[in-house]
Swiss-Prot record:
Compositionally biased spans, kind Basic and acidic residues: 647-662
Primary gene name: Nol10
GO CC, any one term: nucleolus
Protein family (similarity comment): Belongs to the WD repeat NOL10/ENP2 family.
Organism of origin: Mus musculus (Mouse)
Primary location: nucleus
Matching Pfam families: Beta-prop_NOL10_N, NOL10_2nd, NUC153
WD repeat extents: 50-90, 174-213, 228-266, 270-308, 310-349
Modified residues (Phosphothreonine): 481
Name used for this protein in its record: Nucleolar protein 10
Residues the record lists as N-acetylmethionine modifications: 1
Chain segments carrying region Disordered: 526-560, 643-687
Keywords: Acetylation, Coiled coil, Nucleus, Phosphoprotein, Repeat, WD repeat
């Protein structure tokens, strides 16, 4: 049993603890219970309350005697008898179950909706009948007055199957492309279906007409919520004649009064996960909403959180046992969850002993084995002068010594050595002073940059020095004394930012690896101290190391996920604060100062270009010909020739004039060599 408390509400997990394999014999099970404390203290409320791999849905019959659950693999349904606290029967199915409904007060009439469009009926003896619906189904509800089953799924139609006549009736045509969930009000029979567009359509089964539409997707968007996609309806539940709760795929729960199209309250789970199920707890006016990560219990009037439940594995379904404080969960694991919350109500009558058990735990919250006793050997008794108490009720024989009351031990110790407390006090003071001295010296050696990293490296080096396996452990160079990494502890640019996203995501993995390395060093030390034996140690099986490594991997994966969720929440809060600042900020025009000696002509040129673009082509050609940029001439064959001259800037004109003057100056300074004539050569000219 595991006890957790949130908002001073205690939650008892009755399904936690180690489970024994089925193939173990009774003798080995009893031996394990004697040796293992966790196995001995576990509570198996219902025998074999688990599935082979995963549990998908779980429900309780109306009379409260039977608990039915479906799961895989292979697809099956299991029925548990609460009066016998054991499994009553198990039936394997052809395909996985999407959802099911118990039509009778006990388990004698059950309807299953499969993921391959089949609808399967079971009676008390077993399989009874099977039929199919036109499209894949996602949910269904049973209307008791007319004996109609309403199926919704990947279609705009709501299929109706009458169980009295044994045939399909005309379907209800909705305005949605697909429907996800549905529910029927037990008081007045109103049928409601949740669509993929985020709407809830309400129908009257008596006249088969739509009587109202609620736009939940629009109402779920609030100032505090952050929605990135269109919310679809993922859960639907009626409470009484006028109340209805709607869960969306973005993690919001909306409470409606059927007389209004506006929600009374919008509750956000802050996880962004689809709402799996919604339940009402009338005695305390609570709403229990669950997604795949958490079950939240909050007040339906104010929305104030009452308590929450976060299991180890993802949730598939949640069932509240009627008129009690017991909660059943279907998880992504073989074990099905059983939780008892005494504040919600008493324990069911088939497990009324839970009330007495929880009361005893509340009276003795810290009662652990031998906490109030001191273990002493026979030599210790001789030193204390208590050998005459051997065999009396004051001493309890255990192994090679005795257990005695801790208060009696302190009294006798004080009488034998009155100055023991003073000596103990002086030793403690001396130890504290030595520790502070060691820390003081260590702090002086730490660099200015990356002090925590340097402290971690120093601790690892000290552990290596203390280790007795210096030959077996491969010695690695110390980063602190290596000149290649010297800048990392001197330059502030290399400071590790512990608030960055990369550090927070990698830190759980690094810490797990360091812990695993320390654990391996301790194990190697223990092995060297013991005699070298080829046989396996007795207290631990051969696959224990692999199981521990897998547990470590699961642990750091959960820590990384937790850090990622915290980062997302911090990012969401920053965006909300930035949005509030932007809303409060008043924008003002900005002015720019032009340097002295420059002329601002951008507006004028843009206005001139705009006027030029508004003119016709003929006017633009005339204007360009006037400025000399366009030259039109006729050719001999009757065609026209256009020559465009690009405008030059002032700088280009100045540069061209300077080049012209330079060429003229060089021409004047040049000495001509035309007066020099060479002699004519003899022979034929070279060709």
């Amino acid at each position: 049993m595991q006890v957790s408390s949130l908002n001073e509400v205690k939650i008892y997990s009755l399904s936690c603890g180690k489970s024994l394999p089925e193939w173990l014999s009774d003798r080995k099970k009893r031996a394990l219970q004697k040796k293992n404390v966790d196995v001995r203290r576990r509570i198996e409320l219902i025998q074999d309350f688990e599935m082979p791999t995963v549990c998908t849905t779980i429900k309780v019959s109306k009379d409260g005697q039977y608990i039915l659950a479906t799961g895989t693999y292979k697809p099956r349904v299991r029925c548990y008898d609460t009066y016998q606290l054991s499994l009553k029967f198990e039936r394997c199915l052809d395909s996985e179950v999407v959802t099911f409904e118990i039509l009778s007060d006990d388990y004698s009439k059950i309807v299953f909706l499969h993921n391959d469009r089949y609808i399967e009926f079971h009676s008390q003896s077993g399989f009874y009948y099977k039929t199919r619906i036109p499209k894949f189904g996602r949910d269904f509800s049973y209307h008791y007055p007319s004996c109609d089953l309403y199926f919704v799924g990947a279609s705009s139609e709501v299929y109706r199957l009458n169980l009295e006549q044994g045939r399909y009736l005309n379907p209800l045509q909705t305005d949605a492309a697909e429907n996800n969930v549905c529910d029927i009000n037990a008081v007045h029979g109103l049928f409601a279906t949740g669509t993929i567009e985020g709407r809830v359509e309400c129908w009257d089964p008596r006249v088969r007409k739509r009587v109202g539409v609620l736009d939940c997707a629009l109402n779920s968007v609030t100032a505090d919520s952050e929605i990135n996609s269109l919310p679809t309806i993922s859960a639907l539940k009626f409470n009484g004649a006028l109340s209805m709760a709607v869960g969306t795929s973005t993690g919001q729960v909306l409470l409606y009064d059927l007389r209004s199209d506006k929600p009374l309250l919008v509750k956000d789970h802050q996880y962004g996960l689809p709402i799996k199920s919604v339940h009402f707890q009338d005695s305390l006016d609570l709403v229990l909403s669950a997604d795949s990560r958490i079950v939240k219990m909050w007040n339906k009037d104010s929305g104030k959180i009452f308590t929450s439940l976060e299991p180890e594995h993802d949730l598939n379904d949640v069932c509240l046992y009627p008129s009690s404080g017991m909660l059943l969960t279907a998880n992504e694991s073989p074990k099905m969850g059983i939780y008892y919350i005494p504040v919600l109500g008493p324990a069911p009558r088939w497990c009324s002993f839970l009330d007495n058990l929880t009361e005893e735990l509340e009276e003795n919250p810290e009662s652990t084995v031998y906490d109030d006793y001191k273990f002493v050997t026979k030599k210790d008794l001789e030193n204390l002068g208590l050998t005459h108490l051997i065999g009396s009720p004051f001493l309890r024989a255990y192994m090679h010594g005795f257990f005695m009351d801790i208060r009696l031990y302190h009294k006798v110790k004080l009488m034998v050595n009155p100055f023991a407390y003073e000596e103990y006090r002086k030793d403690k003071i001396r130890q504290k002073i030595e520790e502070t001295r060691a820390q003081r010296v260590q702090l002086k050696k730490l660099p200015k940059v990356n002090k925590e990293l340097a402290l971690k490296l120093i601790e690892e080096e000290e552990e290596k020095q203390k280790s007795t396996l210096k030959k077996k452990v491969k010695s690695l160079p110390n980063i602190l004394t290596d000149d290649r990494f010297k800048v990392m502890f001197e330059n502030p640019d290399f400071q590790v930012d512990e608030e960055s996203e990369e550090f927070r995501l990698l830190n759980p993995l690094v810490s797990r690896i360091s812990e695993k390395r320390k654990k391996q060093l301790r194990l190697l030390e223990q092995q060297e101290l013991k005699d070298e034996e080829e046989e396996e140690p007795e207290g631990k099986p051969s696959d224990a190391e692999s199981s521990e490594s897998s547990d470590d991997e699961k642990g750091w994966v959960e820590e990384v996920r937790k850090q990622r969720r915290l980062l997302q929440q911090e990012e969401r809060v920053k965006r909300q604060e930035q949005l509030k600042e932007d809303q409060q900020t008043v924008l003002k025009p900005q002015f720019y100062e032009i340097k002295a000696g420059e002329e601002f002509r951008s507006f004028k040129e843009s206005a001139t270009k705009q006027r030029l673009m508004n003119k016709t082509l003929e006017d633009r050609l005339k204007l360009e010909a006037k400025h000399g940029t366009l030259n039109v001439s006729d050719t001999t064959v009757g065609s026209k020739q256009l020559t465009f001259t690009l405008k030059r800037s002032e700088q280009q004109k100045k540069q061209q004039e300077a080049e012209k003057l330079h060429r003229q100056e060089r021409k004047n300074l040049r000495r001509s060599a035309s007066h020099l004539r060479s002699r004519p050569r003899r022979g034929r000219p070279f060709h």
